[in-house]
């Protein structure tokens, strides 16, 4: 079974060809360099860039494979920036009509959940997933491949969004995640005393409080260095994530745990996460950010279930 996966939910244009759970090829174009000067993604510009990028990616695709060999076309339908999603949908629809191939809608977060399973890594169920990105922070309990339940989520800002906002305020650059992660890795000093927020839901998150404490310390000059502020933010944010996820592990007793989403590329988070369970599944770094392979993989597992 050959599946084309299409991902355009935010600022990455990506397509991938997957055969029986294995990636044959993937092509991605990032818009990060475009948005560095703005400190974040501008939806209208992102949509226009997707239109240009999809045309380029289509050429790569046609050079790689006879399109008639594709069995199914999967695309990200939600959540995401509406204009960006529309570009992917129109591209997928045009191919579907031209090739007479069925379309498969895929939820972007489902794709991140299964990103660690790309290239036939086995997920044992029930499973518990931690999905962390610029737009989402969720704990997902999966009884099986498609019986999902969100058991915890952020009540305000997503963790990736906070990384970007903190980094922007400290004039460190965009995107904030890799920059702050690198600073944290080399920092040897004392951390600021920051309070971990409490939430009414046992497994829910609240990152705006952490962000506000960090920005207040910066604005009031209650810090020794910019590195101290950045490292302190990561130290408390990642450990807060891990502590909440530990509670969920104790409650649901999963057979495996998964990490997904753009923030899953964070080295400190991966280091902490791997010690939580005997069966931990990470995406490869190239599959941590938004990509077409995870969309194709999700579709493959769905089709495999139905076959």
Curated annotation (Swiss-Prot):
Keyword tRNA processing: yes
Cofactor requirement: Fe(2+)
EC number: 2.3.1.234
Record GO cellular component, one term: cytoplasm
Enzyme class: transferase
Residues annotated for Fe cation binding in this entry: 108, 112, 290
Binding site for substrate: 131-135, 164, 177, 181, 266
Cofactor note: Binds 1 Fe(2+) ion per subunit.
Physiological role: Required for the formation of a threonylcarbamoyl group on adenosine at position 37 (t(6)A37) in tRNAs that read codons beginning with adenine. Is involved in the transfer of the threonylcarbamoyl moiety of threonylcarbamoyl-AMP (TC-AMP) to the N6 group of A37, together with TsaE and TsaB. TsaD likely plays a direct catalytic role in this reaction.
Similarity comment text for this entry: Belongs to the KAE1 / TsaD family.
Protein name, entry field: tRNA N6-adenosine threonylcarbamoyltransferase
Organism: Mycoplasmopsis synoviae (strain 53)
Species classification: Bacteria, Bacillati, Mycoplasmatota, Mycoplasmoidales, Metamycoplasmataceae
């Amino acid at each position: 079974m050959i599946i084309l996966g299409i991902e355009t939910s935010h600022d990455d244009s990506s397509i991938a060809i997957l055969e029986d759970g294995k990636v044959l090829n993937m092509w991605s174009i990032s818009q990060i360099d475009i948005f560095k000067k703005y400190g974040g993604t501008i939806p209208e510009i992102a949509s226009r860039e997707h239109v240009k990028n999809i045309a380029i990616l289509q050429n790569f695709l046609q050079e790689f494979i006879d399109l008639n060999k594709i069995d199914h076309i999967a695309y990200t339908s939600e959540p995401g920036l509406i204009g960006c999603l529309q570009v992917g949908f129109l591209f997928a629809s045009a191919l579907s009509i031209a090739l007479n191939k069925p379309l498969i809608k895929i939820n972007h977060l489902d794709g991140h959940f299964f990103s660690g399973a790309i290239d036939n890594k086995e997920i044992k169920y029930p499973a518990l997933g931690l999905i962390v990105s610029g737009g989402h922070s969720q704990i997902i309990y999966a009884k099986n491949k498609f019986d999902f339940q969100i058991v915890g989520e952020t009540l305000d800002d997503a963790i990736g969004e906070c990384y970007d906002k903190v980094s922007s305020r400290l004039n460190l650059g965009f995107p904030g995640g890799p920059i702050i992660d690198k600073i944290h890795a080399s920092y040897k000093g004392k951390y600021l005393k920051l309070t971990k927020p409490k939430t009414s839901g046992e497994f829910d998150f609240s990152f705006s409080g952490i962000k506000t404490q960090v920005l207040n310390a910066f604005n009031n000059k209650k810090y020794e260095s910019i590195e101290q502020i950045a490292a302190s933010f990561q130290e408390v944010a990642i450990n807060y994530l891990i502590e909440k996820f530990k509670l969920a592990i104790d409650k649901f007793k999963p057979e495996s745990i998964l990490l997904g989403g753009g923030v899953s590329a964070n080295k400190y988070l991966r280091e902490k996460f791997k010690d939580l369970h005997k069966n931990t599944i990470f995406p490869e770094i190239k599959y941590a950010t938004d990509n077409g392979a995870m969309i194709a993989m999700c579709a493959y597992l769905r089709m495999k279930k139905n076959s």
